[in-house]
């Protein structure tokens, strides 16, 4: 029986970047890995309502830099930056080194697999029909410019006695093409009937040129954001 490899893991170093960007010797590696896990768990627990897409952790010269990608930056920052300062202090306590927090806004949450899967799980927990939740997410993603999307739910759908799996796809989702920019995420909906698993694949187009192209795109987006901030001032 054919099994699917994790789409993000397969593309690491080709067109996908790591979520932890640091190098450590053998002595410190386990401690860094453990503190990364604790930081992520802490942030995901604190920022449940902030629609957090991903957390990037860097460790420059005995300090830690955390970049939070979120669809609701206002909730993360808080009134006059109070909330983000509390997060910074807590992260410094967990890791034992000075911490810095950067916040990056996710402009199109409909094209982010993590946010789409969480949206579907929250709808399922509110007893929205699973087919309606799936189709709504697929339509929103295609409207925002996705090349293709596939959504799969599995479990006791609609309270059925026997668990089953259903999926809905629109456009194309080429899982074998390494240059295909596929965003993938998984989440769980805890309903009265049990746990329902949700998987989302979003195909955003092909990236030619590998990691160098990704870095150029990131640099240009940072420059655009800086220019946008200057114009607002």
Curated annotation (Swiss-Prot):
Gene3D superfamilies named in the record: 3.30.300.20, Ribosomal protein S3, C-terminal domain
Listed InterPro entries: KH_dom, KH_dom-like_a/b, KH_dom_type_2, KH_sf_prok-type, Ribosomal_S3_C_sf, Ribosomal_uS3_bac-typ, Ribosomal_uS3_C, Ribosomal_uS3_CS
Gene Ontology cellular component list: cytosolic small ribosomal subunit
Keyword DNA-binding: no
One Pfam family cited in the UniProt record for this chain: Ribosomal_S3_C
MF-aspect GO terms: mRNA binding; rRNA binding; structural constituent of ribosome
Domain KH type-2: from-to ranges: 39-107
Primary role: Binds the lower part of the 30S subunit head. Binds mRNA in the 70S ribosome, positioning it for translation.
Name this protein carries in UniProt: Small ribosomal subunit protein uS3
Taxonomic source organism: Buchnera aphidicola subsp. Schizaphis graminum (strain Sg)
Organism classification: Bacteria, Pseudomonadati, Pseudomonadota, Gammaproteobacteria, Enterobacterales
